[in-house]
């Protein structure tokens, strides 16, 4: 793993978010280029005895859902997301796009 990613993940978990033992940490990463950082964040959360919950969003897939989703579907998705977020103690979001 690139040492810069290790250093960034450690800083996010231990300094920025200050994850503590048994903290439930929602890690949301967007785009393929953010996977290495997400993986390292999981390791760092476990290292401080936190509990990671990882979610990946791929914008092109989301677009397909949103192009055809019903109002009811969107409301249910929002309710489910809200309930899960309410159960978390910490949130770390990572956004990235393909570098083409």
List each model region and its residues.
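Active-site bordering "gate/hinge" segments
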Residues: 1-100
